[in-house]
């Protein structure tokens, strides 16, 4: 609807106005940087000046200012027009948006107990503020008037999209509901936002609280040297000198499951990882999931939908539940069959070593690595020296330059969201500034898990001039020990290309209104997944896949083995992904929520009825499935496989020309796909 509501997606759902007057500078505090124009290079947030104490007064003032702007729109004596209503609404909330981008971004990558407490305090206010806008009858009347008389305003394509999206956001926000139902909707929106927040905070605590402490060096058998060095460093940081510590962060737990010879220790860390949020402690998420699914269903019913998935999917390319399930059901049998073949290979490896047991979940990665080596003579550790992080970064920049002519230059003297983050200026092929890209690579305790692309400022136009975006890509790679290189796996390298594809989507954005920058959830993964294709192209590998010590380009024999073995393991990967997609959908197609809903039993039935083998858990189990429970991919986790169909088609357009950097195809892809307002244009399927 406007830039403020859009910014909410970065951290919290925007909400309530407060009429409290706050001094710009609290007694004894430093000046609040949010109350002045940023004087930093390219106008990025002054991270080095922002303190936690600055957020609350700035957010309260931002909400107050936007409320006054809304009042002015409503009180305008002139007849509603596109400019005095739709554009005015789109441009409202400048301060609030400014603060939300900083607050949302930093609470995701550098959260603290103080920030989490502030989130719990502000969520109800922000939820109310959002509803105060969406449920303002006088404001909606003006929006509706413009919508119903749009022919008289002679709008261009972008203006029509803004009008349609604005009107739709009010309708989907409950503007047409009677007052009693609007009151109930407010309650549900606040409840949902708080439950989503609680879920995320609990998951982070569960991830951070566990440590596998190893005292005996023999228990490290099988682990690569750099993994051992990092575990020793983690132990030292926790005051456990002389020991080794492994955590539930992926760069720590995954190598342990993949290489550690000690089966009992693999079991211990595997169970800790897959039971996050399900330990019957203060961070338990089972009741949170139950209440959240129930509240979403109640909201959907209130809005006139039979279930929450129907409410969500109406806005997506899939449109309805049948289309989603048809896609998942089409892929599931072959994926599961392939996973069972891989399981047979794994059990064969166990028997080869004299084991008299069948594989369990904590055995899969360990014995799969052995099976792959037996089949293809390929060890993941053979490839890692060729995927040094700095080289991989140069690889993605090379691809972008070859495709679009854009360049990335590191900026040293600029505020950063974290001291370890890097900043780059992106310039178009004609030298004009496109935006700033942050890259935050390494895991740390206050950082959310996984990898994602976000932003600290959206692109728009102000006074006729383009306001460039500030984009950030966030990862959770293991930070190397002092003086050691950051060596990535092939999967981690693919992740860098993936998130960079999202970043290009943000950097290329060129719209005049905040409200037209959104695209359907099941489309948004297309730019990222297309970018992955270049990661393994021989022409690109020769540029970035160089040995970190010798500079030798990755040998063709190793590339051949990597390509040959590329599909091995897809049974596991696709099955665990589809299992999570089914879990997400099945929660949100429920037509009623039993009072005694047992989350563990529900999950077991959803996956058991489809024949999921016990050795493969869902990629995310219910109690730590942030994609769906925290709101970003609710009834939308299927989007990755949906977009995969599109990205294969899109990359094929390059391959058919015989040039993976074909400038004509690249130009069309940028124009029709990487510009959000034009997401529907794909190849010949326009």
Predicted regions and their residues:
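C-terminal motif of bacterial Sec signal peptides marking the signal peptidase cleavage site
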Residues: 15-16
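Conserved small/polar residues in nucleotide/adenosyl-binding loops
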Residues: 680-686
């Amino acid at each position: 609807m406007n830039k403020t509501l859009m910014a909410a997606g970065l951290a919290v759902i925007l909400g309530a106005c407060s009429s409290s007057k706050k001094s710009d500078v609290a007694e004894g505090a430093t000046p609040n940087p949010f109350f002045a124009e940023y004087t930093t290079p390219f106008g990025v947030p002054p991270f080095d000046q922002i303190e936690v104490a600055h957020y609350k007064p700035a957010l309260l003032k931002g909400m107050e200012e936007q409320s006054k702007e809304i009042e002015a729109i409503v009180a305008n004596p002139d007849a509603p027009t596109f400019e005095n209503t739709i554009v005015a609404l789109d441009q409202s909330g400048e301060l609030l948006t400014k603060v939300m981008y900083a607050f949302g971004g930093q609470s995701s990558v550098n959260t603290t107990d103080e920030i989490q407490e502030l989130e719990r305090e502000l969520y109800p206010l922000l939820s109310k503020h959002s509803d105060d806008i969406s449920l303002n009858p006088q404001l909606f009347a003006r929006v509706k008037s413009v919508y119903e008389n749009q022919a008289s305003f002679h709008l261009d394509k972008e203006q029509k999209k803004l009008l349609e999206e604005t009107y739709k956001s009010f309708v989907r926000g409950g503007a047409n509901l009677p007052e009693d139902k609007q009151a109930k909707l407010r309650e549900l929106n606040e409840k949902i936002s708080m439950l989503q927040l609680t879920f995320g905070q609990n998951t982070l605590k569960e991830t951070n609280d566990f440590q596998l402490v190893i005292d005996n060096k023999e228990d490290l058998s099988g682990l690569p040297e750099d993994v051992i060095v990092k575990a020793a460093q983690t132990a030292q940081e926790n005051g456990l000198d002389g020991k080794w510590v492994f955590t539930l962060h992926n760069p720590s737990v995954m190598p342990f499951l993949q290489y550690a010879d000690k089966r009992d220790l693999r079991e211990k860390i595997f169970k800790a990882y897959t039971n996050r949020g399900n330990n019957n402690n203060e961070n338990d998420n089972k009741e949170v999931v139950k209440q959240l699914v129930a509240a979403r269903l109640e909201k959907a019913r209130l809005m006139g939908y039979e279930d929450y998935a129907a409410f969500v999917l109406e806005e997506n390319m899939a449109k309805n539940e049948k289309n989603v399930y048809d896609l998942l059901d089409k892929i599931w049998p072959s994926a599961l069959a392939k996973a069972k073949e891989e399981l047979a290979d794994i059990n064969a490896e166990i028997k080869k070593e004299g084991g008299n047991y069948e594989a369990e979940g904590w055995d899969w990665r360990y014995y799969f690595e052995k099976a792959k080596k037996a089949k293809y003579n390929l060890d993941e550790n053979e490839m890692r020296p060729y995927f040094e992080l700095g080289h991989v970064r140069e690889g993605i920049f090379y691809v972008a330059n070859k495709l679009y002519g854009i360049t990335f230059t590191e900026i040293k003297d600029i505020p950063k969201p974290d001291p370890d983050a890097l900043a780059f200026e992106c310039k178009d092929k004609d030298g004009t500034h496109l935006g700033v890209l942050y890259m935050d690579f390494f895991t740390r305790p206050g950082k959310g898990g996984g990898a994602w692309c976000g932003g600290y400022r959206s692109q728009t136009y102000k006074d006729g001039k383009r306001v460039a975006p500030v984009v950030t890509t966030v990862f959770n790679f293991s930070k190397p020990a002092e003086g050691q290189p950051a060596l990535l796996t092939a999967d981690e390298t693919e992740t860098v290309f993936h998130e960079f594809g999202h970043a290009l989507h943000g950097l290329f954005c060129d719209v005049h209104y905040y409200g037209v920058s959104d695209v359907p959830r099941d489309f948004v993964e297309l730019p990222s997944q297309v970018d992955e294709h270049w990661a393994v192209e021989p022409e690109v590998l020769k540029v970035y896949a160089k040995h970190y010590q010798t500079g030798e380009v990755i040998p063709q024999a190793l590339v051949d083995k990597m390509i040959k073995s590329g599909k091995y393991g897809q049974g596991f990967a696709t099955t665990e992904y589809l299992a999570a997609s089914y879990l997400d959908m099945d929660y949100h197609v429920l037509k009623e929520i039993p009072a005694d809903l047992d989350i563990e039993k529900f999950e077991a039935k959803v996956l058991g009825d489809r024949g999921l083998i016990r050795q493969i858990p869902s990629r995310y189990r219910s109690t730590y499935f942030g994609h769906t429970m925290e709101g970003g991919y609710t009834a939308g986790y299927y989007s990755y496989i949906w977009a995969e169909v599109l990205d294969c088609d899109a990359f094929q357009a390059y391959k058919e020309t015989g040039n993976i950097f074909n400038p004509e195809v690249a130009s069309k892809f940028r124009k029709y796909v990487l510009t959000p307002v034009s997401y529907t244009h794909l190849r010949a399927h326009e």
